[in-house]
């Protein structure tokens, strides 16, 4: 396991870096956006609920971080044109992208496969893998403008070992792991872009509550607790690390 939960980031770790976080309105995305801004990054907050993004925006400003930006987008309905329009807007505003955290995700249902709704399956695949893939393609020219770019795809333990009833979510995370291998290998030795997958582990989030409704959330780490690995992967201390499968926290005993 490759875990950096004890990492001690420099206060200015991400100074002068432009970082986009998807699903930035709450949970791990919110914690990552706040943490990246605290360490100097200009954060682009992407999500589907403007009110949530505005709250995170206000939190960053109140903490004295660099002025963030808000970009509303719903992966479920996003088209290739939406991604390319977004890239064009970011190019005009920032001229480059130094980091991309694919955090937005959809659980779907934990249910036997023979009862899985095909429309829900397609929604999960769109949000968890298809959308992030085509967004990454649209943003590659901006990432190539950075001297040291990091792309992080959110994985899961069920994307590394399949579990009964996890259906589309598990399959989408296996696809994520495969795409990280492909893209990292493709960009090796010809790009300043590193690409890795990161499994947050058991964390106190709404998705976790939906998946494990009987679990005591206070036995879990908070999103803030697992930020060291997110910071390490996004910052220059992980330079040269690409195509790796990392964990944000040690496995639960």
Regions found by a protein language model. Name each.
Residues 86, 111-113, 117-123:
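Substrate-binding pocket helix/loop in short-chain dehydrogenase/reductase
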Residues 3, 189, 193-198, 205, ...:
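C-terminal helical subdomain
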Residues 18, 23-27:
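Conserved glycine-rich cofactor-binding loop
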Residues 63-79:
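Rossmann-fold cofactor-recognition segment
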Residues 17, 65-66, 96-98, 143-156, ...:
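Active-site loop of short-chain dehydrogenase/reductase
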Residues 133, 144, 148-189, 202:
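Catalytic loop of short-chain dehydrogenase/reductase
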Residues 41-55:
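Conserved glycine-rich Rossmann-like NAD(P)H-binding loop of the short-chain dehydrogenase/reductase
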């Amino acid at each position: 396991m490759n875990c950096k939960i004890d990492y001690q980031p420099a206060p200015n770790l991400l100074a002068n870096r432009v970082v986009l976080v998807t699903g930035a309105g709450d949970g791990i995305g919110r914690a990552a956006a706040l943490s990246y801004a605290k360490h100097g990054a200009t954060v682009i907050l992407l999500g589907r609920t403007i009110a949530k993004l505005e709250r995170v925006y206000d939190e960053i400003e109140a903490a004295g971080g660099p002025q963030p930006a808000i970009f509303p987008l719903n992966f479920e309905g996003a088209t290739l044109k939406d991604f390319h329009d977004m890239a064009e807007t970011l190019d005009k505003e920032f001229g480059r992208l130094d980091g991309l955290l694919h955090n937005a995700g959809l659980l779907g249902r934990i249910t036997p496969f023979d009862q899985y709704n095909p429309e829900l399956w397609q929604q999960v695949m769109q949000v968890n893998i298809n959308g992030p893939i085509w967004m990454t393609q649209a943003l590659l020219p901006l990432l190539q403008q950075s001297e040291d770019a990091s792309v992080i795809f959110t994985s899961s333990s069920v994307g590394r070992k399949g579990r009964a009833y996890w259906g589309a979510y598990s399959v989408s995370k296996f696809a994520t792991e495969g795409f990280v291998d492909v893209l990292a290998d493709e960009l090796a030795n010809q790009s300043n872009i590193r690409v890795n997958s990161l499994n947050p582990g058991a964390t106190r989030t709404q998705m976790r509550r939906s998946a494990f409704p009987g679990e005591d959330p206070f036995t879990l780490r908070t999103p803030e607790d697992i930020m060291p690995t997110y910071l390490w992967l996004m910052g220059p201390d992980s330079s040269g690390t690409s195509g790796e499968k990392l964990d944000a926290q040690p496995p639960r005993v």
